[in-house]
Amino acid sequence: MSTPSTEVISMRIRRHPTSPFPALLLEPNLANAAQLASRLQAAGFEIRIEGSAESALQAQRQSFFFALIVIADLADKDCLVALDALRRRSPRSWMIVATSNCDDHARNVIHRHGGDTCISLPIDPDDLIARLDAFQLRARPSF
C-alpha cells in the first residue's frame, strides 16, 4: 500500500468544500460502489454511481466528470466497447480502470481502449484518493 506524498495530503486539506471534484464510478455491484463512494465523498469528492455502461453514458450526456472510475472485466468484449464509448464521450476526463489483474498486458489493453491508468481489485480507497488528488493537482493548477 502506498502512502500519499506530503504535497497530496496538503492538497486534500485545502480542497474547497463548495467546489467538489466530480467523478463517475461505474460499478455493477452497488454495495461495493456505495462503500467506495462514501470513502471518496468523505475525502471531498462528488461521486455519481452508475451500475451499467448505458447509464454511465447517459450520465455523461448530462454532466462533465473530471474522472471516470470503471470496474472492468477485460475478458468481456462488451466491457471493452464500453471503455471505448466512455472515452469518446469524455476525451478530457481521466479514466481509471480497476481490474482483477493489472499486469503489463492489462495495462496495454486498457490504454488501447482509452484508459489512463490501471489499478488492481479490490480497490484500496487510500490509493485511489491519492491518484485522484494527483490528477486534481495537474487538472487544476490554480488551487
Regions found by a protein language model. Give the residues of each.
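A Lys-centered signature of the CheY-like receiver
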Residues: L121
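Acidic, metal-coordinating helix/loop segments flanking the phosphotransfer/catalytic sites
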Residues: I49-A67
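Non-catalytic signal-transmission and effector/linker regions of two-component phosphorelay proteins
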Residues: M1-R39, A43, F66, R88, ...
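Negatively charged, flexible loop motifs adjacent to catalytic sites
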Residues: S52-S55, A75, N101-H105
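Alpha4 helix (beta4-alpha4-beta5 surface) of REC/receiver domains from two-component response regulators
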Residues: V81, N101-C118
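Conserved phosphotransfer microenvironments
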Residues: A33, F66-R88, T99
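A short, hydrophobic beta-strand element within the central beta-sheet of small alpha/beta folds
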Residues: R92-D104
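Conserved phosphotransfer cores of two-component systems
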Residues: R61-S63, A85-R92, H113
